[in-house]
């Protein structure tokens, strides 16, 4: 287990998962239709944790593919929502699945790419920003390989003074997004908003005075 894997396993084991939200993300609800996902289309949710957004996507009629490093996160998701799953292991990747939900337990960088069938869309609420800068280019490349031509990504990022806090979540500038996805046909900024200070906000509690949140729609050519 490398340093990054140990870090995330430790967070889940200790219950330090303030990044997990109990409510469906409002930006997902607001912008999912703009991706024009076909009926019963496949949606990839990388570094999915136990996100309730996955269940919401399934209820909209989509087939959801989640990839998560920490098995405890997936087991909690299945138990909390009383989902009856089947189990399969392929190489080093374990899979929990139903007819419309595939949850892979593995390091996304070690996963045999051929195991994931092409997807119509990718929903990234907190995956890119969970990765340090040196890993982000490889992550983008992997995801784009799984995305069908013409498919779209709904991506949420944030920007703040990285010198004060090392992350995660990491600050990702609009300039980095433009560079990282330059091979795509279209990059659209759907939303740019200064975050309102809330008592339980991790970054504000660490002394960050300003956080900007962004929502992007990126279409693969």
Swiss-Prot record:
Catalysed reactions listed for this entry: S-adenosyl-L-methionine + a thiopurine = S-adenosyl-L-homocysteine + a thiopurine S-methylether
Residue numbers binding S-adenosyl-L-methionine: 12, 47, 68, 125
Enzyme category, top tier: transferase
GO MF annotation, one: thiopurine S-methyltransferase activity
Superkingdom, taxonomy of origin: Bacteria
Any one cellular-component term (Gene Ontology): cytoplasm
InterPro entries linked: SAM-dependent_MTases_sf, Thiopur_S-MeTfrase_Se/Te_detox, Thiopurine_S-MeTrfase, TPMT
PROSITE patterns per UniProt: SAM_MT_TPMT (PS51585)
Localization annotation: Cytoplasm
Keyword vocabulary terms for this entry: Cytoplasm, Methyltransferase, S-adenosyl-L-methionine, Transferase
EC number of the protein: 2.1.1.67
A single GO BP: response to metal ion
Name of a matching Pfam family: TPMT
NCBIfam families registered for this protein in UniProt: PRK13255.1, TMPT_Se_Te
Family stated for the protein in its record: Belongs to the class I-like SAM-binding methyltransferase superfamily. TPMT family.
Identification of the protein by name: Thiopurine S-methyltransferase
Native source species: Legionella pneumophila subsp. pneumophila (strain Philadelphia 1 / ATCC 33152 / DSM 7513)
Gene behind this protein: tpm
């Amino acid at each position: 287990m490398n340093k990054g894997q140990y870090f995330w396993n430790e967070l889940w084991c200790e219950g330090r998962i303030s990044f997990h939200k109990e409510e469906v993300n409002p930006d997902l609800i607001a912008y999912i239709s703009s991706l024009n996902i076909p009926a019963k289309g496949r949606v990839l949710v990388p570094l999915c944790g136990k996100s309730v957004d996955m269940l919401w996507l399934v209820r909209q009629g989509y087939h959801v593919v989640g990839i998560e490093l920490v098995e405890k996160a997936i087991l909690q998701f299945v138990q909390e929502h009383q989902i009856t799953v089947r189990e399969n292991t392929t190489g080093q990747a374990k899979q929990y699945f139903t007819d419309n939900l595939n949850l892979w337990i593995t390091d996304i960088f070690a996963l045999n790419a051929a195991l994931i069938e092409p997807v119509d869309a990718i929903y990234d609420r907190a995956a890119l920003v969970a990765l340090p800068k040196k890993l982000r280019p490889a992550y983008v490349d992997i995801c784009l390989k799984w995305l069908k031509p013409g498919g779209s990504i709904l991506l949420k990022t944030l920007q703040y003074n990285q010198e004060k806090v090392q992350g995660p979540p990491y600050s990702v500038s609009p300039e980095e997004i433009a560079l990282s996805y330059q091979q795509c046909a279209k990059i659209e900024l759907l939303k740019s908003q200064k975050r309102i200070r809330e008592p339980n906000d991790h970054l504000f509690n660490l002394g960050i005075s300003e956080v900007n949140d962004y929502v992007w729609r990126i279409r693969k050519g």
